[in-house]
Amino acid sequence: MGTYRKRFNEKARSGHMAKLKELKRIRNKQFTRQDENDERVENPDSAPAESSTTEPNANAEILEPLTEEEKKMKKRKLQELFTPKESKVSRLKKKRLDKFIEHQLKREERKTIIGKLQDYKIDTSLLTSSKRLGEGRQTKKEEFKEALSLERQGRGNEQTNEILYEEYEPKVWDEYGEGGSSEDDDGEDDFEASFGSMPKPTDNEEKKSSGFIDHRPAKFGGSGLSFGFSNIKVINKESKTPKKKYNWRQRVEMEELKKHGKEDEMDFDTTSEDDDEEEDQEEEDKMHPSENPLEEVESADSETGSEKFDQNDVANEFKDWANQEIKKLEGRDQELVTPTLNIDYKPIIRKEDLDDGLQEAYVPINENSTRKAFYVEVSRSDEIQKARIQLPVFGEEHKIMEAIHHNDVVIICGETGSGKTTQVPQFLYEAGFGAEDSPDYPGMVGITQPRRVAAVSMAERVANELGDHGHKVGYQIRFDSTAKEDTKVKFMTDGVLLREMMHDFKLTKYSSIIIDEAHERNINTDILIGMLSRCVRLRAKLHKENPIEHKKLKLIIMSATLRVSDFSENKTLFPIAPPVLQVDARQFPVSIHFNRRTAFNYTDEAFRKTCKIHQKLPPGAILVFLTGQQEITHMVKRLRKEFPFKKNSKYNKDLETPVSKMGINSKTTDLEAEDIDFSVQVIDQDKFKSAIRYEEDEGNSGNGEDEEDEEEEGFEEVLTEGQTANDPLYVLPLYSLLPTKEQMRVFQKPPQGSRLCIVATNVAETSLTIPGVRYVVDSGRSKERKYNESNGVQSFEVGWVSKASANQRSGRAGRTGPGHCYRLYSSAVFEHDFEQFSKPEILRMPVESIVLQMKSMAIHNIINFPFPTPPDRVALSKAIQLLQYLGALDNKEMITEDGKKMSLFPLSPRFSKMLLVSDEKACLPYIVAIVSALSVGDPFINEFELGINEISRKPNPDENLDDKIREHDESTPGMDPELKKELRSKFYKSRSQFSKLDKFSDVFRLLSVVSAMDYVPKEQKEIFMKKNFLRGKLMEEIVKLRKQLMYIIKSNTSKENIAVVIRNEDLKSDIPSVIQIKLLKQMICAGFVDHVAVRADVLFPDDAKITNRTSIINIPYIPVLATRTPNIEDCFVYIHPTSILNNLGEMPPKYMLYYSLHLGGNNKTRMNTLCDIASTPLANIARKGLLLTYSKPLTGQGLKTVNLSPTERYCYVVPRFGSTVDNDLKIGWDLNPIAVHQKKQKGQWTVIKFITRKGFQTITGEEKEKK
């Protein structure tokens, strides 16, 4: 019979099953959880003895680990379990078995610990929410709620008992008849009669009595009232008398009394009656405790508050009584009576003492200032003093001067008309600025103005107001100066001060500088403020080191608007923000009236509105804002024609001025940039015709127009007595090119019985204050010079003004009384299209002149210069590139010797370069004349301004003549055809007379007329200019600039420059020779080397096809370095119609130099040509710059390279002008081959000089002879 075979791994399986049962038992144990205080014990027979001894309580606070004996016993049992009986075990197996047993023991211990942890559980309802962490102390309500919850859970302690339960002190009642009153007995009898007699407690009941009232129901052993606790021990305490209560005010008073050694007055705060009342109230509270503890707390708080209030009142009353008694005892109870004067006194009411509701501006005060008082006495007439008192800034003199004394930089904001321009310099002068014996400010007072007219007029007015010190006021502008050695107040343009800082950066002659009209933000103003900010800090530093030798410099920036954040908040400009003082202008209310619709033709709308104001509204001057000279001249003529003076009036002759005739053909001609509205679309034919009809039918308006007028606002007033709708209108123009004498007429009173009307540009916004203006007609537009950085085109564009400018214009109507401003645009356009402030000029103009001046002042890092508004980096890089082309800067952007010389001239760097290279073959006088003419402007009056342009010729198919030219004759019917023909003949004869020097060069026509003017006698100059159709004002400017340039050149080149005098005879020059003309073209090219254009058919014959019928003004050119586009026609530029080349009659030159590019009305870019240039001279001029590169030496066709040494050679190369060969983004072209002398420097062949053909042949022959 076979034996039973044990199953594989049976012992392990049995052990595993035992473990599972044990684990199941442990898990089921949590469902039979016993109470902690339960003393039941399991049956010892149901479990082995070890379990009762080894199984500890899982919920015990401390679990004791197994002892060493217990661990050994357990290990021995495991060994017996796994070791078979009577079997031999090898040493290795035994070692493995020990390791296994040790591992199993650790597993058992781990399972035991995990099982114990599973058995341990807590009630999560007892935990506190984490969201309440950090709340701090609990309120009484929260404490009571938590204590009640713990009590219900059976977890109460002494702390919860203190919160939930209150102690009750049993009161001992006296027996009846002992010490009691009859009133008390009566009260008790009444109580017994009402509620019955109270049962007396027995001795047992007294022992069981509790200090708490048991409010449980009667069936549970309570009193039957409510829930309560009867298991609280009774605490008997002796009754204590309530302590005297003090509030915090009484404690403070008590401490003060103790310090001063006085008696404690707190003893009088309460009385015995009050104490008795308090005791009775406390006893009553103990007898009837509140059910809600919170109500008890609140009631206690309210009672203590009322109690404190009552105690304070009692204490104060007693204190007052005690003080009165003390005064009686000391004899101080008698009242002193002040004697009264029987005089009628009227208090003086000063305007400055009244509260105006304005907040005073904060002005930092230098507490360490040691300035001594110093003033200059000035005597003025009563009339001038009264006029000064009426100015708003006069009342702010103290505040302004205090700010100036305590701060090196001050900003003053005041609208035009506040008097800041004329009064602030007088404040400074009277405070000692400019006085030689002044201890702190002995230097001059300098005032800069952006316009020459403002500098001259303000200097005259301040000199008049300074009375006996008026001779110490002078001005200095570009061509005129009245400043002397004793001048203490100097008005000047900002360019003059910039020039002075180049020679004296510290401005040692000045003690204060005033920058006026800073809100205009032109280039000179921005660069001045940036340099002066450094100068102020430098002078302050030097003054700190040596106060006697160096004095501080004060800088005052004045603006007509509140746009000063670029100055005050610019930490780079002013590390410490300067104080900003605001001066209110003398402003009356101004009613602003917007148009319902924005008129397309704003000039006609301005004319209609002006006529309506004159015919319907009371007296008052009218100020009309337009964009340019041509619009103003046309408007003046229309208004004078509509409201004329009588025929025999003397004012008719005064008002007779030539008026420009407008005739524009967009296809054949371009006027001057000032006369063209580049940003406004060309008016189409229908609107143009309707405008003409409106102009013709202006006087015959129908009923429909009257109905429209009635709907307009701002015409509620009526004419006054003596006024009629046909009164004459005294119309005057005002623009920058107008002579100063004509500009001053706006300040004169109009003739009797007429109304003043001024038609002006934005010059009248801030620079000049015109008196008597009550009505303002604002077109909302202005003409500004803009510069296109992408193509270098400058243009005058008409666009919307800023909101700040519009507010300035409207403010003109409120200077003398309430006024009206009529805006020729809608409020929607004003809010949507108008910018808040205009763009600074430094961001819309080329900055090469500024960069060169700053480089000459050793300001090399232009980026870090403290500009109020930093210029665009693209504009700066283009300016630096141009200066490198001209040779003013080297490759490292450092100024060269030529650049330093160029910076001495107050001109564009281009003109400075021309003057620098003009000292050859006696060409200097010619270059001076050319530069002066180009700087000032074209002095010729063109045929379109005269109205003599020929329109009877047959139209050219390429020109596409439209109806505008034909309608031009209709617009000028006053000129007789024969007279027009004769005038045209004289015009062309005059032009041909000045065009004989060179038929390809417009610049030599300018040279001819300027040189011819030198030989005309002084008394015949006016006739000469009229006869030759020249602008008198521009010719005078050209003569003055020539004298200034000659003076600068001679003073910097002659040895004795102090005695340099320029006379009119020094300006005379002979007719230039042929050689001089060739040299002059190269000198002009030196200044405009990057303004070279090549005829388009030379580079792109397929794209630019020129036929015999193509007019000269339609032949395209391409500028050098123009950006190459897929459509090459986008790069084309064309000759200006007023050029001398227009009457050439042959193909224009291959290469042309141009002065500037202008965008015409037909979207064609026109170039104002200067002269032609040949290939070799162009290469000779461009070789010093970065525009010329060279090919490798040419070989073949008899051309050989002559090697003088391994590092020197003579050869022919092909120069390339413009972009390099491998550059497809810019335009460039090859010039004619030329012989050069090259040397090898740093591994590259460099051109040293050019060699003529004869010179190269000579060198080649000499080399052959040597061989």
Curated annotation (Swiss-Prot):
This is Probable ATP-dependent RNA helicase DHR1. The gene is ECM16. Residues 675-858 form the Helicase C-terminal domain. A motif (DEAH box) lies at residues 516-519. It comes from Saccharomyces cerevisiae (strain ATCC 204508 / S288c) (Baker's yeast). Residues 1-67, 168-233, 255-313, 693-720, 955-976 are annotated as: Disordered. Interacts with snoRNA U3. Component of the ribosomal small subunit (SSU) processome composed of at least 40 protein subunits and snoRNA U3. GO terms for cellular component: 90S preribosome; mitochondrion; nucleolus; nucleoplasm; small-subunit processome. InterPro entries: DEAD-box_helicase_OB_fold, DEAD/DEAH_box_helicase_dom, DNA/RNA_helicase_DEAH_CS, HA2_WH, Helicase-assoc_dom, Helicase_ATP-bd, Helicase_C-like, P-loop_NTPase. ATP binds at G414, E415, T416, G417, S418, G419, K420, T421. It comes from the Eukaryota. Probable ATP-binding RNA helicase. Required for 18S rRNA synthesis. May play a role in restructuring of the pre-rRNA. Residues 175-192, 264-284, 695-719 have a biased composition (Acidic residues). Keywords: ATP-binding, Helicase, Hydrolase, Nucleotide-binding, Nucleus, Phosphoprotein, Ribonucleoprotein, Ribosome biogenesis, RNA-binding, rRNA processing.
